């Protein structure tokens, strides 16, 4: 048996909840990946310039960060979390329906901002609830969760592709000239970096010819079962006002033993709190959080900044690898270079699939160590083989594999240090989102001023910083464990300052 009986029993016990959280993350993946391929058609729909339409990316990403923080506010009860997940997943379907009717770039940006809020809530709550359900076994289920977001992100462009315009979707006298560079412009569009395409001029007035609306409506239909599944979970848990479900099923022997084990653990935790050693609940006790040891804050900071770097690498590499490949020293054809971002995301999804069985056998901290070493080594390989087309494709695939499981592994590891209270999830999700947005701007500006060769140099610097911060996190983890052991050995009341933040 691939999974042990205890884990299978736990999964069966929480099957519906787990499957619902996975499906919601599929919805998140659909929404996060559709904007890039459809942006030129949306430019035509809103009759806006390339510089204006790229700021729709910013509206989505910024509100995703806000939504991630907002999602952390609703973590106190399962009922609050599920109702917010229902509203968020339903919002995404509504957004897909509304987008074809947005004929002004400001209205489109507002709609995408609302979608970003919904996506941020989904990101935080889904991760957090799985951590709360599975605790020390959460790593494998987090890997599956992030596979679903990758699967949704792969499916979204495939749905959109048949409906994208092969020629300029605004018919005018300049259409023929603009259409020659259309595929190159589509691949060069990067969020938050409008200067990347500022030298291209496309017509703003003329007859609109686009069928991209059908792509959005198809994605809305595909996503619609997700809010239905969330609502059904709310109903099954008896959280719908006026509807109370009686669960009269008997537990199996394994499930009964597991429930008894949970009750015993809860009693131990409560007894531990009575003696003033519930450090893991500090994040929920705002009045006492500032009395926590420095290691508590250092763990959050090191983990969040590491993800700031790694998710930033994902964003900047997928955004600029095409622009790097079509210039010196590679000078790839536009069509050939266009495969690189797709290859990168395909191997991220494949890596997340591979990480599911690996995470069952390997601890998250070990996976992180191997992944971060692999990312740095791959950038060195890319730099050494910068004149090789084969090396570029191999390096891109390897980079996607190494980066694929960093976030779920870091989340599982950090929550393990902090005893699985879901406290770090909001901080880590926000840090990762900020990295993806900020580092795209930073790397894009460096490439603009220093040339395309700086693309790989930035990658080496960022990956080295990420590994260094992870090494610091390992040291802080050791110090935190030592401090916790020392605190547990002291009788309550001997050290007033130590117990003030724990009581």
Curated annotation (Swiss-Prot):
Region of interest (Disordered), residue spans: 484-503
Keywords: Membrane, Transmembrane, Transmembrane helix, Transport
UniProt GO cellular component terms: membrane
Residue intervals passing through the bilayer: 19-39, 53-73, 82-102, 105-125, 139-159, 214-234, 289-309, 338-358, 366-386, 392-412, 427-447, 455-475
Membrane topology: Multi-pass membrane protein
Entry's Gene Ontology molecular function annotations: transmembrane transporter activity
Domain of life: Eukaryota
Main localization of the protein described in the UniProt heading: membrane
InterPro entries per the UniProt record, alphabetical: MFS (IPR011701), MFS_trans_sf (IPR036259)
Compartments where found: Membrane
CDD domains: MFS_MFSD4A (cd17453)
Protein family membership: Belongs to the major facilitator superfamily.
Protein name: Major facilitator superfamily domain-containing protein 4A
Species: Xenopus tropicalis (Western clawed frog)
Primary gene name: mfsd4a
